Amino acid sequence: MVPLRRPRLLLLATLVGCVTPAPAPPPVAQPPPGYTPPPGYAYPPQPYPAPYAQPAPQPVPGPAPAPLPAPQPLPAAPSNRPLLGALVGPQAWQAETRAVLDELKANLSPDKQQLVAGIPLTFDPDPGDVNAFAGCDDQGAPFIAGTEGLLEAIDAIAQTKATDELFGTRTYDAYTAAVTPGLVSSPGARAILPAGIIPAQYWSDPRRISRAHEIFDETVGFTFGHELSHHYLGHTGCAHGQPAGVPPVASDFNRFITSAIPTLNQWNEAAADQAGVNNLLDAGKARSATAYRWNEEGGLWLFDFFARLDGASGSTGIVSFTRTHPNPAIRIPVLQADAAGWRFLHPG
């Protein structure tokens, strides 16, 4: 589960700075410390155009230099990776998340599919809460839930990371510096992307829009794949393959979260991280012939976001989640190791 409600801030509870002037040309955005991106196609960073300069005086002719090697062409987007459209607003985010979750379920082993096939996904429209969790309702039926605040955060991560990857900007740093202080101190704060973080000239670039869509999908894929695994791993104790039930109403979410907290522990969270990323990588491999191949990067950036929140919180309530959940900074290398283990067993 990924709660982040002030003053009680939890991270992925059954899931889960400052802006500095960029030199010209701006540096390429860097991944979390120690992270080596998985192999695969990535858009090359695009430098800003060089300023116009007057031609230099002609040099005195000399011996002709040896010819330089022919430049290597930039990698082209594979034919199976079409440009994707924009995901705008809660309805689009929710529909996309449901589609991703269905794809994850389809790539589970048959025994796990049977346990979770009918589990509903529901959303709390509260934008002030950043949270996702798996639970059981009052009738003992399983469900998975997420909040609008979580989808706002994932969209902002996707929008900024796509921009940085393509254009060498630092919009993710600017975004986290802008929102983390409020999220850990103000009940009215939201994780939505503030206006002006992404430069206007990049906003409508179709490559940026498509890349943001891909990052959104693999981030919600890890997030809700983690939640789904709490059911088929038996952590909730209520997923037995029963027919789909009616998901709980949003007003009951706080009560369900509170009642679930005593059962949460670091072993379950670590197991769900591993199962969730394995499911995501299985689905990514299965779709790679026709679409973008999902990987663990979305989970890594989500953990990085919560690690920055942890750093911004100081002595406030967010630190308390480490009593029942692995520290997000620790989860980054563990998730990397989980993904490396999957690749060792699934070469190619």
Predicted features and spans:
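C-terminal capping/extension segments of zinc metalloprotease domains
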Residues: 19-21, 38, 62-143, 147-152, ...
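Active-site scaffold of zinc-dependent metalloenzymes
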Residues: 135-217, 234
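Composition-driven detector of proline- and glycine-rich
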Residues: 34-55
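Sec-dependent bacterial lipoprotein signal peptides
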Residues: 1-16
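Short alpha-helix carrying the canonical HExxH Zn2+-binding catalytic motif
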Residues: 215-229
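A short, mixed-charge helix-start or loop-turn motif at secondary-structure junctions
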Residues: 210, 214, 254-261
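Bacterial Sec signal peptide processing site at the extreme N-terminus
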Residues: 18-39
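A structural motif
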Residues: 186-202, 231-258
